[in-house]
Design a protein with these regions (language model features):
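Glycine/proline-rich, positively charged
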Residues: 88-137
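A short, structured active-site edge motif that brings together acidic residues
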Residues: 76-88
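Acidic-residue sensor for enzyme active/binding pockets
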Residues: 55, 63, 82, 106, ...
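N-terminal binding-site loop/beta-alpha segment at the start of enzyme catalytic domains
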Residues: 1-78
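A short acidic, helix-capping loop that chelates divalent metal ions and anchors anionic groups
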Residues: 22-27, 86-92
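Residue-level marker for beta-strand->alpha-helix junctions and adjacent short loops that shape enzyme
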Residues: 23, 58, 84-86, 124-127
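Short beta-strand segments at enzyme active-site cores
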Residues: 50-54, 80-81, 116-121
Length: 137
């Protein structure tokens, strides 16, 4: 699969990534865990090295699912996760206060069982928090 440089970050990602929302959140029921792990690993076997998740998918289960599926080759993939929801749930509105960003990052690190988040970005803009405060952290 073709690779791309992600902006000026130095990250190299596959031209096609796997958005993992539908595995544990969205329209209908969550995908069976075994089937979801097989799908993630098959995507990796086909050359996908870029996987996108967020704490709100599940909520709180999608990142752990990715960890379980990708643990054998974690150092060969790029995982993107996000912040921006209050309480980690879409239904609770947005929250991009710096203290929430830090709490989300720390919780995501635990669920992903890693010491680094490859790409961490804002899922929804919080109109109550100036963008300067969001990016300063």
């Amino acid at each position: 699969m073709q690779k791309r440089q992600l902006g000026n970050s130095g990250l190299e990602v596959s031209a096609i990534g796997l958005g993992c929302m539908g595995l544990s959140f969205g329209d209908g029921l969550a995908t069976d865990k075994t089937a979801a792990i097989e799908l993630i690993r098959r995507a990796h076997a086909l050359g996908d090295i870029f996987f996108d998740t967020v704490e709100a998918y599940g909520p709180f289960v999608n990142e752990a699912l990715l960890d379980e599926a990708l643990a054998p080759f974690r150092d060969k993939v790029v995982i993107a996760t996000k912040f921006g929801f209050a309480g980690g749930k879409v239904s609770d509105g947005v929250d991009s206060r710096p203290e929430n960003i830090r709490a989300v990052a720390e919780a995501s690190l635990r669920r992903l069982k890693t010491d680094v988040i490859d790409l961490f970005y804002q899922h929804r803009v919080d109109p109550a928090v100036p963008m300067e405060d969001v990016r300063a952290r």
